[in-house]
């Protein structure tokens, strides 16, 4: 195993994985009073009005070129998945806002070390992709004593 792969494995340890709600239970989903089907059929201008202010302002300014490229990848992947092919979508666009057309896909989001698979459910709509692929690990400190942490340097050695 190379050092880069070892780093990637270290990066995956300690991650909190959110519970995935199965698609059968998506019928109860509502976003600002709208069902998923209504959101999918809604024009982008109307959908933008439903978002919180930060996301609304970001989308009103228009998508960045890398976000447009990601949306093209997503649309292409959906076409291929309809034909029965398996497609992996990888991206570095952590600041992409999750749109209704992304629901049901697994997008691999880069966290600085490795790609973290994020299954997009309806409850993710309006959030950023980066919110679901944390960039830092949960720190698990060792026993207090010598060489543990800087704050425990003053514990007397036995």
Curated annotation (Swiss-Prot):
Keyword rRNA-binding: yes
Ranges in a coiled coil: none
Positions of transmembrane segments: none
GO molecular function terms attached to this record: rRNA binding; structural constituent of ribosome
Disulfide bonds: none
Keywords in alphabetical order: Ribonucleoprotein, Ribosomal protein, RNA-binding, rRNA-binding
Gene Ontology process terms (BP): ribosomal small subunit assembly; translation
UniProt cross-references to Gene3D superfamilies, sorted A to Z: 30s Ribosomal Protein S19, Chain A
InterPro entries according to UniProt: Ribosomal_uS19 (IPR002222), Ribosomal_uS19_CS (IPR020934), Ribosomal_uS19_euk/arc (IPR005713), Ribosomal_uS19_SF (IPR023575)
Annotated Gene Ontology cellular component terms: cytosolic small ribosomal subunit
One of the Pfam families matching this protein, by short name: Ribosomal_S19
Keyword Ribosomal protein: yes
Family: Belongs to the universal ribosomal protein uS19 family.
Role description: Protein S19 forms a complex with S13 that binds strongly to the 16S ribosomal RNA.
Protein name, entry field: Small ribosomal subunit protein uS19
């Amino acid at each position: 195993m190379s050092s880069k792969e070892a780093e990637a494995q270290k990066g995956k340890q300690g991650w909190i994985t959110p519970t995935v709600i199965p698609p059968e239970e998506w019928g109860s989903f509502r976003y600002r009073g709208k069902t998923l089907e209504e959101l999918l059929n809604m024009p982008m201008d109307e959908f933008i009005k439903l978002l919180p202010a930060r996301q609304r302002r970001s989308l009103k300014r228009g998508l960045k070129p890398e976000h447009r490229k990601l949306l093209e990848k997503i649309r292409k992947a959906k076409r291929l998945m309809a034909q029965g092919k398996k497609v992996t979508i990888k991206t570095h666009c952590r600041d992409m806002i999750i749109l209704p057309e992304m629901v049901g896909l697994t997008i691999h989001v880069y966290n600085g070390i490795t790609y973290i698979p994020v299954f997009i459910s309806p409850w993710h709509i309006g959030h950023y992709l980066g919110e679901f692929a944390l960039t830092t690990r949960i720190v698990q400190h060792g026993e207090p004593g010598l060489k543990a942490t800087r704050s425990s340097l003053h514990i007397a050695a036995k």
